[in-house]
Each structure stands twice: as structure tokens, then as C-alpha cells.
Regions:
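Active-site hotspot residues in diverse enzymes, especially metal/ion-binding acidic/histidine motifs
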Residues: 1-238
């Protein structure tokens, strides 16, 4: 981001212009295609959602994103599209090009002339290069400084939020109520994720990312908590 800011001579404001960064600054091509057809892998799962979200062709300097994530065709997928783009072009390109650019067969399962160096599948267990690219994408789209500023604007008290504990304890956070509901033996209470997503959603809209991505980022930054950290209980009570 610092490189891009110097290049354009202006500070970054949310949402981070990820397409400009990828295409104009990093000089990478962005293409949409049916990734499952392209790689000969059948779609599966509920609604036949894509398992292959994107692929990085290092030697060709291009990124292929599944057509289902095209924000012009599916505006509701814009957050996921931007994260996939940041994952491929930000994470893999900046972190892993030295691993794959000269060894096209290293991460390929294809026998074609120009296979992708990295194929990202949502169903597979995260390998180190994948969670590294995820974290890079998260920091790129939701920079700590910008997220903290947006949080302070949304919550002038600047305090982190925590899901209200079942047993009251003294702590310095602001508690988030949870809707409790039970029908017979069926517990239909709000999940932790739903409670935290409700806080993350406005910021997700500001940064053009999914509520899930923003919620994870806010948890990593210590602004959202599922339980009161033990040290905070002591600090709050002392």
C-alpha cells in the first residue's frame, strides 16, 4: 500500500482500490472464466458453488477468477471477489512468486502446456502458502490503521466489544447482547458468529469485503471478542 500511495501521490481511503493495485501497480492481468471447466474439475456442494475460486499464473502474470464471483454479474459476491483478487495478486504474487515462477509443475495438477502455478480450492485444508496469502489479503484490504479509524468513528468510546458472558464478570469491554431462543429441545439462539457479524457488517460495507472477512479481521485486531480474555477480567476487576 505504501508503494501504491507514493505512486499515486495520495493517501488510501476505504475501500482499498484492489483492482488498480493489481492491474496498474503490479501489472497483472485479471480474467474471469469457469474455473471448473477450465481445469476439468466438476462442481459439487450446495448450489454448486465454486470450489476453485481463483488461480495464479506467475509466468504469464495473470489471475483467473471464477465467473461466479464477477461483481458485475453477481454484486452480492463483490466482497468475495475482492478478497480472492487480493489473495491471488496480493498474497501469492508478492509472497510466493519466487517459489513457483521457475517451477510450473510444483503446484500443478494439469498436463497442459501452461498450467497455473497456484490453484486455490476452498475445500482443501489450508497449506502455509494459502493461509499466508489469506492473511496478506486481509491486511491489504483492511489495513490496521484504516480499520481502527473506522472503528473509532463508529464507536466514539473506542472500546472493544465482547459477547455478553453467561456469568457476569467485571471487564473493560462493551457487551454485545445475544438473542436467546429455545423451542422445545431445539436451541435457536444466535450463534457467536451471527452476533459478531452484526457488528462487522457496517464496516464490511465501508471496506467492500464480506462480513465474515471483516469479523475475522476485527477479532485479529482485538476489537471483537467471543469471550472476555482472562487477563482482561483481572484488569477490569482490579
Amino acid at each position: 500500500l505504501a508503494e501504491y500511495c507514493r505512486k499515486i501521490g495520495a493517501p488510501i481511503v476505504p475501500p482499498v482500490p484492489i483492482e488498480d493495485i493489481i492491474e496498474k501497480h503490479l501489472k497483472l492481468g485479471i480474467e474471469f472464466d469457469d474455473t471448473h471447466r477450465l481445469f476439468g474439475v466438476p462442481r459439487s456442494g450446495l448450489g454448486l458453488d465454486p470450489d476453485i475460486l481463483g488461480a495464479m499464473f506467475f509466468d504469464e502474470r495473470r489471475i483467473v477468477i471464477d465467473t461466479s464471483l464477477d461483481p458485475e454479474e453477481n454484486p452480492a459476491k463483490e466482497g468475495r471477489y475482492r478478497f480472492t483478487l487480493a489473495h491471488e495478486g496480493g498474497g501469492h504474487w508478492r509472497l510466493h512468486s519466487h517459489l513457483f515462477a521457475k517451477d510450473l509443475a510444483k503446484a500443478s495438477f494439469l498436463d497442459e502446456a501452461a498450467p497455473p502455478s497456484v490453484v486455490c480450492r476452498s475445500s482443501q485444508a489450508k497449506e502455509p502458502v494459502e493461509w499466508q496469502a489469506d492473511f496478506y489479503a486481509s491486511c491489504l484490504l483492511m489495513p490496521r490503521k484504516l480499520v481502527m479509524a473506522a472503528w473509532d468513528e463508529m464507536f466514539p468510546d473506542r472500546k472493544p466489544r465482547v459477547i455478553a458472558p453467561a456469568v457476569p464478570v467485571e471487564h473493560p469491554f462493551v457487551e454485545l447482547p445475544r438473542i436467546e431462543c429455545r423451542i422445545g429441545n431445539f436451541d435457536c439462539s444466535e450463534t457467536d458468529d451471527n452476533v459478531l457479524d452484526g457488528v462487522a457488517r457496517p464496516l464490511a460495507g465501508q471496506f467492500l469485503v464480506s462480513p465474515i472477512a471483516m469479523r475475522i479481521r476485527l477479532e485479529k485486531l482485538g476489537l471483537l471478542h467471543r469471550t472476555v480474555p482472562h487477563q482482561r477480567i483481572i484488569a477490569g476487576g482490579g
